[in-house]
Amino acid sequence: MDIQQGGNDLISLAATIRTELQQKLSSKARIHLPFDEDRTEFDKANLRFTQYERPTYLAIVDPVCEDDVIEAVKYARGKGIPFTPRGGHHSVTTTMGRFQNGICINMRPLNQMRWYAEKRHVTIGGGAITDEFVRFVHDLGMEVTFGAGLGRLQGKYGFLNDNMVSCKLVLADGSTVIASKDSHPDLFWALRGAGHNFGIALEATFQVYPQAHGGIHHTWDLEYTLDQCDEVFRTLNSVYESMPAELAIFILWLRQSSGRKHIILVNLVWSGPAAGADPYVQRFESLQPVLNSGRKSVPWPELPFSTYKEINKLFCNPEIWLRGPYKMMGAACVERFDLKTTREFFESVKSLSEEWEDRGWFSAMFECLPDQRVREISDDATAFPWRAGSNHFLMLNATPKRMEDRKVFEDHLNYWKRRFIETSGYGRLQQYVSYGNGTSTMKDPPEALYGYEPWRLEKLRNLKQKYDPDNVFRWYQPLLEP
């Protein structure tokens, strides 16, 4: 039953939640309900990158301090009401669709940041988003890997979670712990790769590093036709064999660009002195792109909004999200790009883009990131399972305008996900957890998200039993099925 369609029992329950929970929160904390006369704040917090297989909320809590989060957790547990935190509203994971008519704890107000110069540590609140964090760190003259845990600087610094120093967490019973290498080290291990199964992060502290080259990064966008696909990916495979820590490469499919249709865009980012990029840029320029942006040199915080034709300005704009509300994703990881599979995939995207031009969109983004520091760290150092097996991350995207057409779009994603797995070089799905379960019609097993080694899954499950025996945190990419 959907409260937004008028279920009387749910309306009554939502009103009760506000009455009872508001008394336990600080005076400036707010609770928003879907039937409020002025729905502005509820609608703002309810907005989401995709409406496909989305969760629904009886109430959305805006905390103003950590105690508000703790009280909301204790209240929900005591009443047997499901609850979930949320931050940047960007999840595409369909497992969240199981969460219906619960309490949403909007973490965005807890976006405070602190700097400890002596140790070069930055502490960020659980509601901070990427742009806020990156600008704060950049203004300090520092940097670290950032992205979805992965990032362009991982060849230098490892993953973002490799640089976590500690995390303050609300557990399922409402208690708080600080996990670090010296305090609850078992939980600290689990947080770095599977943390959403164990609690709500109130804040986390990270090691950061002095900026190289004044925090300036250099970027090139080069566009190719579908006829050039084999040459592009043959070159990419070759470059990756000796890819330096300063280089990161993204590949995108664009339905149209600069008056041309069906374009493969190669974005190169170089984090060292500009001249060092020349041998790699020249490899791609020698393929005769139909458009070459030339070099752009930008500060680190502007990089996401300067690369691949500034598309992130759309992805990060909530006002744009509802223009294509039903975003779906299929993802996989490959050791090398199989030329035949990759070309046939783009041919399929072109064909479907033409056939369904007025009824939806098809696209893709491939991430090819350096791994020097990533692989220097022991494979068992954190819960992240793919330190030695995660060369290229593939995100296949499809967005129908109407859910009546969903099957065509889901089938496309599922088919090509299977094809890429078959030719991945790994012989199985090795899935970055934030990219998993992008359609509701093809399930990623826990092993694909958390690792196939028996010891790794056993350790995680034992820790789950220790810290969340009732499987309260079971909505986002659950380690254990609800």
UniProtKB/Swiss-Prot annotation:
Pathway: Secondary metabolite biosynthesis. InterPro entries: BBE, FAD-bd_PCMH, FAD-bd_PCMH-like_sf, FAD-bd_PCMH_sub2, FAD-linked_Oxase-like_C, FAD-linked_Oxidoreductase, Oxid_FAD_bind_N. Keywords: FAD, Flavoprotein, Oxidoreductase. Residues 53-211 form the FAD-binding PCMH-type domain. FAD-linked oxidoreductase; part of the gene cluster that mediates the biosynthesis of alternapyrone derivatives. Alternapyrone is a decaketide with octa-methylation from methionine on every C2 unit except the third unit. All the domains in the polyketide synthase alt5 are apparently involved in alternapyrone synthesis, that is, the 8 CMeT, 7 KR, 7 DH, and 4 ER reactions in the 9 KS-mediated condensation steps required for alternapyrone synthesis. PANTHER family: BINDING OXIDOREDUCTASE, PUTATIVE (AFU_ORTHOLOGUE AFUA_1G17690)-RELATED, FAD-BINDING PCMH-TYPE DOMAIN-CONTAINING PROTEIN-RELATED. This is FAD-linked oxidoreductase alt4. It comes from Alternaria solani.
